[in-house]
Structures are given as C-alpha cells and as structure tokens.
C-alpha cells in the first residue's frame, strides 16, 4: 500500500543500488504464513527483510523464493518490508548484457524489483508436457463475471493502489526523474539527489530515468507540459507538445479531467524501441519519435499517434484498469 525507495544510480559504472522500503497489508480473510517472492534476476536480490522470516525454497534459475514468516501476517495487518537490489556489470554473458543503465540515458521500471505472489508465468503451458508430469490442464482465463479476478491486471496481481515516494541520486551533471512531483533537490557527497512524491494513490508501476537533457516547456491550460530530450534530438519536440495538448483537449472533453498537475515526456536512448506511460511521466525512446523524419506529409505522423496513445494511458490503465 506504500512505497518509499532509495535509488543510488552510478551511470559512469553502469551500476545501481536500490533500497526498497514497502508497506504491505493482508487484505485476505486468513493469515499469511508463506510469502512467495519473484525476482527477474535472482542474483541481484541481495537482502530481504519481511519482519522475521526463514527461506524455505529457493530456485535461483527461475528467480523464485518462498519465505516462511516467523509471525504470520494477520488479516488487515500492515507490515514494513525491505529489499536491497544491486545491479552491476558482470562480464560477458550468454544472453544480452543489461543495457538500461548507461552513461547518459538510463531508464528502468519497477519490474527490476521483487514481486509478491505465486507466479503463473513460470508454469509449464504445453498440454502434452503437463500430462506427462500429471499437472492437470492449464488454467483458463477467468470469466468476465469473476470479480475477484479483477484485482489481477497486466501490471500487477492482487496489488492495491499505493502511496509513492522515492529519492534517486545520480551523477553531478545529470537530472534524475521519477513519477510524482519534486519535493527537493540536494547534493550529497558531490552527487545530485532528487526526492519525489505522488499526491494521490497510483498503480504499483513506476520508472526511473537519468540523463543530461535539454528541457522544452509549454502548458495545457494551467498544466505544465515538459519534454526532456537530447540536445541533438530536438526536431520533433514541438510536435510532441502539440500532440499532448490536442490529446488532453479531446480526452478531457470525452472522458474525465486529467488527474495530474504535470505531463512529462522523457527521451531515452534507442536500446529499446517503445514508449511507456507511468503516472504523469512518459519515457519515450529516441527511436520512435525524437529522430523521426516528418517532412513528407503523405507519411503517417507516428510521432503524433504514439504521443496520443501514451497520453490515453493516463486514463486507460492509470484511472481505469
């Protein structure tokens, strides 16, 4: 129900340390004795504190752990938990090396942190293989009338909307961003630290970015619209701002008022080719808009439609899901 993360980012060495401090609540009718924890890269999860626990199962290949609580979490009870995750270069691997922490243009989201609950995504899905192992038939999609299943979305399972606060520290020549509103900026040991908080509950889905950007600012009504971009990639920034303004005009007229006090579009390098909408904050790859050639009027203006699509997620996901 609450997140307060401390992120220490070191772009120059492609490394970071995250101390995740969360408040969790048992919303079920029975005590919780065992806690299932999934981690995308198991070796990055270096510390776990669930208020007293023992590790009863650990599958490092799947990044899956089961902890038994020394004191079960009672119905309605809240508890503070802590995780520490460390990411750093680890030589050359058989797969693709992590590329989201870079010298200029870091972007990663909350999926680098642990998640709670049984992970159906790790189940064997092949029907023949399941029969060989006597695992029964694969789970079917829930019925539309199953209200309990509505707590599970493509973003998170059985997760409440939460209060979000965070501090991110980065190199002295960079700006670090996260969803929410800037509370303060400080300098600690020569590094720039930015503290953010969201003023209303939000999904358990957030991002962190750090780079040396130029910023172009405009407004929609009294709402600041900001685009953070590489100084060499300013070609389509005005078109993005126009797309934000026109999208907000249409969505407010046909849906509901925009729920936040700012809109930020933030460029990240072409190591990924997508944009992703978080609460009031939209990371946006250089490869799908910032360096697009829009001079031919007969070609589809995908800068406009990608921007409009991401703004729409501020309603469809970040209000209704």
Task: List the model feature ranges, each with a label.
Residues 86-160:
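Glycine/proline-rich low-complexity spacer/linker segments in large multi-domain proteins
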Residues 21-41:
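Ligand-binding face of N-terminal immunoglobulin V-set domains in extracellular IgSF glycoproteins
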Residues 31-32, 42-104, 152-156, 189:
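A surface-exposed beta-strand-loop module
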